[in-house]
Amino acid sequence: MYKIMKKLVKIVCCNIIYRVKYIGIEKIDNNKKYVICPNHSNILDPTFIFPIVDNLSIMAKSEIFKNKLVAKILKRYRVFPVNRKERDVKSTLHAIECLNLENNSKLLIFPEGGIIKDSKEIRKKVKNGAVYISAESGVEILPIFITRRPHIFQKVYVIIGNSINIPKEIKQDKEKIKEYSTKMINNIYDLEKIK
């Protein structure tokens, strides 16, 4: 069922609703673990990543889990909630557990913590969770840039960057985690220049 859903999402979201072009897809090694970190400007952003990677878990805002039916469907496809308004230790621990499920487990986190609509907010909003999880788990971050706020039937570029190693020793250093988080978000938006 999971593979069928991946194919369906690719056809509907990546070929019909939008025309998605992947750049740097060869940088994804599906035999490896990654903390996948894209920018976020569109509710459908996860559907551009879902078809191209294996064993993906997705961290999503807790608000979308209020509907029981929606929550049941999301959990079936390894989507789990995070409370964005406060430090959510439970979700952070669950994220690390997800990376330990299989040898090639992957975790999708939007490091901006939500959809960024205003272009003035680009590069200014970044949360530290992705870098902390990467440092704690020893799993590299894979930065990805997705075309911002595309119109329906428009071409969408999904640009994959080189993976980033986060030193394990910084996990207890708040300033270092913040520093690496800022570098990461800049790295993500710098990928836009490649297209």
Residues covered by each model-derived region:
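Glycine-rich anion/phosphate-binding loops
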Residues: 86-92
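Non-catalytic C-terminal accessory region of glycerolipid acyltransferases
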Residues: 93-195
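Membrane-anchoring hydrophobic helices of lipid-metabolizing enzymes
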Residues: 1-35, 45-48, 77-79, 86, ...
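A generic structural signal for well-ordered alpha-helical segments
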Residues: 13, 51, 74, 99, ...
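Short, flexible active-site-adjacent loop segments at beta-strand->alpha-helix junctions, enriched
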Residues: 26, 40-41, 62, 85-86, ...
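Catalytic core of membrane glycerolipid acyltransferases/transacylases, capturing the structured
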Residues: 30-86
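Short, glycine/polar-rich helix-capping loops at beta-to-alpha or helix-loop-helix junctions
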Residues: 5, 65-70, 151-153
